[in-house]
C-alpha cells in the first residue's frame, strides 16, 4: 500500500528550507511513501533543485498561493486565506487524495482550519494535541498540549475519553489508567475547572486514578495524563528546555580540561546513548485527536531532522490504521460510558502504567 501524505511546506518558522529537505530524505528511506508538497511552487522547486530531487516520482508539488503566518489570527487563516498551503493540504485529505496532513504551522490556525475542513468525531467538541512522553517502561499519553488554551470541565473529560480510546486501540488495554494534572493529589486542590473535571471523571466509567502532579509525568504513574493546552504546552516546552540544558552542561563539563576530554572519550558510548534519549527532536509530531482524518502537528521551530520525525508519525499512523482503531475505540467507549456503572476510580491513587514498549506511533507523539 502506498502511503499518501500532504506536507504543508510553508508552515513553521523555517518553511520550505526545512520541510522540503525532510520530505526528500523521508521518501528516499520509505519507497512506499508518496508526499504531496503543498505551497508556493517556486519556493518548493528551488529547494528540490538544490537536493537534486525535482524528478523524484515520490514527490508531487501542489501549488498554493497563500501562507498562514505563525502570528496570523485564526480568523485570517480560516476566512481570508482560503488558498493557503495549510488549507489546500487539508482539502486534499478531505477529498481522499491523501491519508494524512503534516504541518508545522500556527497551532490555533491549524486546529480551526482542521475542524472546519475535516470535522470532528461524534461527541467531540474540540480536537486535542496528544503526545507520548517517555517514561521508564515506555510512554505516557498526555493531552492537550496546545490546541486549547481555555477548557471547560467537559472538554477535559472528552480528552480523557480520547486518550483512553487511543491507548486502548494501540496497546490493547481494556482499562487504561487516567490522571488529571493538578498542583496536588488531593481532591480539594486546583481551580474550579479542575475540581469539576475531577468530579466528572470520578463519575465516569473511565479508570480514573485521581490527580497527578508534574513530577508524575515521566514516572509512568498512569497511562494517560489530561490537562488543558496552556498547562500542557508549558510542561512540554519546559521539559525540552531542561533536556537541552542538561546536554549543554555535560558537554561543557567534559570539555573543561584535557583530563575531562579523555574521560569523555572513554564515556563516549554512554554519552551518545544519553544524547539520543534526551533529544526531543525525535519525539516531534503530535496527532490532533478528535478529527475525522489524520493531522500531525510539528513543532513550529523544528529543523529538518525533527520534521522528518513528524512525517514518520503520519506515515506510521496510516500504516497502523490508527484513525480507524481510534474511531472504533471511541464508539465502544461511548457505549460503555452510557451503559456502565459508576466508577469513582480512587482519587489520589496511582498505579504503574504497563505495556508501553513500542516506539510511539504518529498518533502518539509531540510538539505544539
UniProtKB/Swiss-Prot annotation:
<dbReference type="GO" id="GO:0005737">
    <property type="term" value="C:cytoplasm"/>
</dbReference>
<comment type="pathway">
    <text>Lipid metabolism; phospholipid metabolism.</text>
</comment>
<dbReference type="InterPro" id="IPR012281">
    <property type="entry name" value="Phospholipid_synth_PlsX-like"/>
</dbReference>
<comment type="subunit">
    <text>Homodimer. Probably interacts with PlsY.</text>
</comment>
<comment type="similarity">
    <text>Belongs to the PlsX family.</text>
</comment>
<protein>
    <recommendedName>
        <fullName>Phosphate acyltransferase</fullName>
        <ecNumber>2.3.1.274</ecNumber>
    </recommendedName>
</protein>
<dbReference type="GO" id="GO:0043811">
    <property type="term" value="F:phosphate:acyl-[acyl carrier protein] acyltransferase activity"/>
</dbReference>
<keyword id="KW-1208">Phospholipid metabolism</keyword>
<feature type="region of interest" description="Disordered">
    <location>
        <begin position="337"/>
        <end position="368"/>
    </location>
</feature>
<dbReference type="GO" id="GO:0008654">
    <property type="term" value="P:phospholipid biosynthetic process"/>
</dbReference>
<keyword id="KW-0963">Cytoplasm</keyword>
<comment type="function">
    <text>Catalyzes the reversible formation of acyl-phosphate (acyl-PO(4)) from acyl-[acyl-carrier-protein] (acyl-ACP). This enzyme utilizes acyl-ACP as fatty acyl donor, but not acyl-CoA.</text>
</comment>
<keyword id="KW-0808">Transferase</keyword>
<keyword id="KW-0594">Phospholipid biosynthesis</keyword>
<keyword id="KW-0443">Lipid metabolism</keyword>
<dbReference type="InterPro" id="IPR003664">
    <property type="entry name" value="FA_synthesis"/>
</dbReference>
<dbReference type="GO" id="GO:0006633">
    <property type="term" value="P:fatty acid biosynthetic process"/>
</dbReference>
<keyword id="KW-0444">Lipid biosynthesis</keyword>
<dbReference type="Pfam" id="PF02504">
    <property type="entry name" value="FA_synthesis"/>
</dbReference>
Amino acid at each position: 500500500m502506498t502511503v499518501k501524505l500532504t506536507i504543508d511546506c510553508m508552515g513553521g518558522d523555517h518553511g520550505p528550507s526545512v520541510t522540503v529537505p525532510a520530505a526528500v530524505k523521508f521518501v528516499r528511506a520509505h519507497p512506499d511513501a508518496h508526499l504531496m508538497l503543498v505551497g508556493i511552487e517556486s519556493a518548493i522547486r528551488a529547494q528540490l533543485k538544490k537536493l537534486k530531487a525535482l524528478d523524484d516520482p515520490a514527490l508531487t508539488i501542489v501549488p498554493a498561493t497563500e501562507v498562514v503566518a505563525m502570528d496570523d489570527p485564526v480568523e485570517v487563516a480560516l476566512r481570508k486565506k482560503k488558498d493557503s498551503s495549510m488549507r489546500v493540504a487539508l482539502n486534499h485529505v478531505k477529498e481522499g487524495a491523501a491519508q494524512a496532513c503534516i504541518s508545522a504551522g500556527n497551532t490555533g490556525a491549524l486546529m480551526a482550519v482542521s475542524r472546519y475542513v475535516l470535522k470532528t468525531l461524534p461527541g467531540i467538541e474540540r480536537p486535542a494535541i496528544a503526545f507520548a512522553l517517555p517514561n521508564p517502561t515506555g510512554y505516557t499519553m498526555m493531552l492537550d498540549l496546545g490546541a486549547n488554551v481555555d477548557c471547560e470541565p467537559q472538554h477535559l473529560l472528552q480528552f480523557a475519553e480520547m486518550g483512553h480510546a487511543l491507548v486502548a486501540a494501540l496497546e490493547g488495554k481494556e482499562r487504561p489508567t487516567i490522571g488529571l494534572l493538578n498542583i496536588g493529589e488531593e481532591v480539594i486542590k486546583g481551580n474550579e475547572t479542575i475540581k469539576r473535571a475531577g468530579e466528572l471523571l470520578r463519575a465516569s466509567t473511565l479508570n480514573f486514578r485521581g490527580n497527578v502532579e508534574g513530577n508524575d509525568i515521566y514516572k509512568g504513574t498512569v497511562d494517560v495524563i489530561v490537562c488543558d493546552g496552556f498547562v500542557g504546552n508549558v510542561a512540554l516546552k519546559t521539559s525540552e528546555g531542561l533536556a537541552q540544558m542538561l546536554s549543554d552542561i555535560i558537554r561543557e563539563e567534559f570539555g573543561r580540561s584535557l583530563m575531562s576530554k579523555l574521560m569523555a572519550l572513554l564515556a563516549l558510548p554512554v554519552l551518545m546513548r544519553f544524547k539520543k534519549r534526551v533529544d526531543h527532536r525525535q519525539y516531534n509530531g503530535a496527532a490532533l485527536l478528535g478529527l475525522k482524518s489524520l493531522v500531525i502537528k510539528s513543532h513550529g521551530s523544528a529543523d529538518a531532522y525533527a520534521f522528518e520525525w513528524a512525517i514518520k508519525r503520519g506515515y506510521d499512523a496510516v500504516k497502523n490504521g490508527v484513525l480507524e482503531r481510534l474511531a472504533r475505540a471511541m464508539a465502544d467507549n461511548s457505549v460503555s460510558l452510557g451503559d456502565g456503572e459508576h466508577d469513582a476510580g480512587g482519587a489520589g491513587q496511582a498505579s504503574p502504567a504497563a505495556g508501553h514498549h513500542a516506539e510511539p506511533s504518529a498518533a502518539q507523539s509531540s510538539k505544539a
